[in-house]
Amino acid sequence: MNYQVLLYYKYTTIDDPEQFAQDHLAFCKAHHLKGRILVSTEGINGTLSGTKEETEQYMAHMHADERFKDMVFKIDEAEGHAFKKMHVRPRKEIVALDLEDDVDPRHTTGQYLSPVEFRKALEDDDTVIIDARNDYEFDLGHFRGAIRPDITRFRDLPDWIKENKALFTDKKVVTYCTGGIRCEKFSGWLLKEGFEDVAQLHGGIATYGKDPETKGQYWDGKMYVFDDRISVDINQVEKTIIGKDWFDGKPCERYINCANPECNKQILVSEENETKYLGACSYECAKHERNRYVQANNISDNEWQQRLTNFDDLHQHA
């Protein structure tokens, strides 16, 4: 495999994010890189793909900058690009928590746990493990015994914690996310909220899965990633599938977006059921006049109406 996917972040001061974004985009395009990078006055958060040579040049370029000299890159090998375009965007935050009183992880953040230390926390009955990701990420894969917050956006996590505070009272709290960036700010917020014993998986799930000692142990399913790959393996010890097909509940790890562009809900669904239910999550979405699955597959009106009757069987067995 001649390509690599990089995942990285750094909380550091960037004085002029707009100018930085413009210059950085030009550099990335000159090196044929593709991906998504967010920059703000608080730092950088990025994931991109390119050939091994070009991604190595990118990492060297970043490490030559005093602000990013010690930035850690999580690296995955890939068959080709994991993104279709290159975006570098200035933002208010590099990860959107939207707090009234913002947290600076450089001053306030939870204790860092190495993969081995985190594995011990997973085995400790007096420790509560909070998944700091969204519900659809959790449903594809998560650490055994972790708590699943009922959220679809990171910014909703603080409110969910406040509503469920009883679950965590007088417990050691450990949190994790994909690459670590969400936990940097979230664990800092937990400390400001009065939680005393707060820790985080340093480097996130991505680092834990590559650790030679832990080998992804106690991870079930796959890890959701925000690129064309959709998911990657983490557990090198045992393979489990925890995702369930939206329609029949069978084991499934295949995510699609609902074919109704006004819905776009992410659902786990087999190829067979995607065909059967017109790529949609519901009857209403399947019959939507702008159904992308119908358009992409040139399905005739007669066939469309015929497949819509498949939803009748669903309701009969519900």
Curated annotation (Swiss-Prot):
Pfam families: Rhodanese, Rhodanese_C, UPF0176_N. It comes from the Bacteria. Its EC number is 1.14.-.-. GO terms for biological process: tRNA modification. SMART domains: RHOD (SM00450). The keyword Transcription does not apply. It catalyses: uridine(34) in tRNA + AH2 + O2 = 5-hydroxyuridine(34) in tRNA + A + H2O. The active site is at C177 (cysteine persulfide intermediate). Keywords: Oxidoreductase, tRNA processing. GO terms for molecular function: oxidoreductase activity, acting on paired donors, with incorporation or reduction of molecular oxygen. InterPro entries: Rhodanese-like_dom (IPR001763), Rhodanese-like_dom_sf (IPR036873), Rhodanese_C (IPR022111), TrhO (IPR020936), TRHO_N (IPR040503). Residues 123-217 form the Rhodanese domain. Catalyzes oxygen-dependent 5-hydroxyuridine (ho5U) modification at position 34 in tRNAs. Belongs to the TrhO family. This is tRNA uridine(34) hydroxylase. It comes from Staphylococcus aureus (strain JH9).
